[in-house]
């Protein structure tokens, strides 16, 4: 399972020090070093959520509480939404729908940056990672899915639907690398130290986070410092509006979302905020798997396959639950639609 954290890519790669950097090579290098076996925790989190959706669907079918159109809409939503359902379920759609972007890839970039910054700056998340095994498991699932989707965007863009936004990714990395290069020497890592109550608690937290994130304590400290500097710069840009903005709009979108998630945390439990973030990532994963082309799935299968391919196969079989529940023609209509979709060939080829 490929992994790529943009903040860690900038911090650990030394890319900011080279003028001839190639983001393709940097991403390949990083992802090879960070590739992991799909954690059991992540499998369970994802499949439990999918199972919950299917159970709800079957309950409605058995109880005949929904019309045929409503049930088909439920199935369609499972295949066509990329975060909208989660935001609607938590009454956040009006406030955060902009963060999903017009294309999946822009949504991934925004939510990935926001996730990295939020997990670095949320004191509640840090405490949860250290003291609560259940929430620590959820945090691990969030970061793993976030890094996986970012890996697909940067290294396997053919596995994602929609317009290729590679240039947006490169511009964001370039902007972030320049920012880190110019600002990392102005403030020493670990200075200030007002995030945690004491040096002993800081050491304990860093050790726990090191085990959870599988990165060095130095990387954790540097990532926290970079996230803190990005938020401060974003706030300064918004306050002064002088036109001399250091952060491009794509990076700014991620920082703005991180700020909103931190604000949401101030009036809600950490559990709820983590549920929102995880649910959005699961929706994006499911959408990416179903909307990716069959050719890309087949090509990747020859190289070992992707998690999104497993998701796609599951999505293809969701329609099997529409059997004799709402009307006599439901199953027939479903399979006729599938036949038309996969059997569109010129008449001359069928002679």
Identify the meaning behind each predicted range.
Residues 1-351:
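Extended, charged interaction scaffolds in large complex subunits
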């Amino acid at each position: 399972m490929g992994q790529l954290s943009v903040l860690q890519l900038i911090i650990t790669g030394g890319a900011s020090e080279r003028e001839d950097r190639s983001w393709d090579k940097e991403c390949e290098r990083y992802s090879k070093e960070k590739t992991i076996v799909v954690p059991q925790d992540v499998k369970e989190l994802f499949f439990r959520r999918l199972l919950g959706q299917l159970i709800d669907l079957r309950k409605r079918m058995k109880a005949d509480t929904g019309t045929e159109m409503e049930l088909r809409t439920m199935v369609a939503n499972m295949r066509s939404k990329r975060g909208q359902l989660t935001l609607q379920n938590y009454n956040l759609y009006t406030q955060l729908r902009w963060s999903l972007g017009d294309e999946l890839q822009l949504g991934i970039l925004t939510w990935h940056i926001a996730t990295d910054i939020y997990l670095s700056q949320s004191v509640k998340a840090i405490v949860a990672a250290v003291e609560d095994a259940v929430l620590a498991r959820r945090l691990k699932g969030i970061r793993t899915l976030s890094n996986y989707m970012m890996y697909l965007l940067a290294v396997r863009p053919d596995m994602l639907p929609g317009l290729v936004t590679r240039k947006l990714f490169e511009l964001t990395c370039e902007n972030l690398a320049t920012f880190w290069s110019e600002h990392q020497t102005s403030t020493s890592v670990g200075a200030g130290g007002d995030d945690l109550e004491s040096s002993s608690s800081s050491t304990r937290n860093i050790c726990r986070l090191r085990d959870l994130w599988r990165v060095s304590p130095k990387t954790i400290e540097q990532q926290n410092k970079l996230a803190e500097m990005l938020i401060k710069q974003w706030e300064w840009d918004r306050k002064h509006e002088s036109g001399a903005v250091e952060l491009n709009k794509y990076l700014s979108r991620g920082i703005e979302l991180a700020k909103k998630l931190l604000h949401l945390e101030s009036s809600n439990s950490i559990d709820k905020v983590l549920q929102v973030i995880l649910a959005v990532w699961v929706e994006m994963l499911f959408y990416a798997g179903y909307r990716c082309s069959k050719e890309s799935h087949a090509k990747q299968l020859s190289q070992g396959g992707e998690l999104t391919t497993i998701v796609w196969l599951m999505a293809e079989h969701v329609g099997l639950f529409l059997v004799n529940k709402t009307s006599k023609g439901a199953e027939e209509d479903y399979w006729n639609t599938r036949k038309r979709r996969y059997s569109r060939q010129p008449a001359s080829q069928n002679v």
